[in-house]
Amino acid sequence: MPYLLISTQIRMEVGPTMVGDEQSDPELMQHLGASKRRALGNNFYEYYVDDPPRIVLDKLERRGFRVLSMTGVGQTLVWCLHKE
């Protein structure tokens, strides 16, 4: 899976950071220390870490991921990363 989306809400200085969905690479999620959660009312799971996005981005860079783009949507910040 060469593409990855991560996001955080409201404040980017603190976590949690959403790092994956049900289809994400389990080994990568374990490396990030992510836990699988399902929010009340959702019929899908997401992986979260308590780290702020900067820490997550540093970990992903060490694994060969590079940021392709970043945007803000309302109070949510989203990064798209790619690994060659």
Swiss-Prot record:
Example GO BP: negative regulation of biosynthetic process
Tissue expression pattern: In epidermis, expressed predominantly in basal undifferentiated keratinocytes and in some but not all melanocytes (at protein level).
Transmembrane regions: none
Main location: nucleus
Keyword line: Cytoplasm, Membrane, Nucleus
Leader peptide range in chain numbering: none
Pfam families the record matches: GFRP
Entry's localization field: Nucleus; Nucleus membrane; Cytoplasm, Cytosol
GO molecular function: enzyme inhibitor activity; GTP cyclohydrolase binding; GTP cyclohydrolase I regulator activity
InterPro entries in alphabetical order: GFRP_sf (IPR036717), GTP_CycHdrlase_I_reg (IPR009112)
Example of a GO cellular component annotation carried by this entry: melanosome
PANTHER family on file: GTP CYCLOHYDROLASE 1 FEEDBACK REGULATORY PROTEIN (PTHR16852:SF2)
Quaternary structure annotation from Swiss-Prot or TrEMBL: Homopentamer. Forms a complex with GCH1 where a GCH1 homodecamer is sandwiched by two GFRP homopentamers. Interacts with GCH1.
Task performed by this protein: Mediates tetrahydrobiopterin inhibition of GTP cyclohydrolase 1. This inhibition is reversed by L-phenylalanine.
Family to which this protein belongs: Belongs to the GFRP family.
Entry protein name: GTP cyclohydrolase 1 feedback regulatory protein
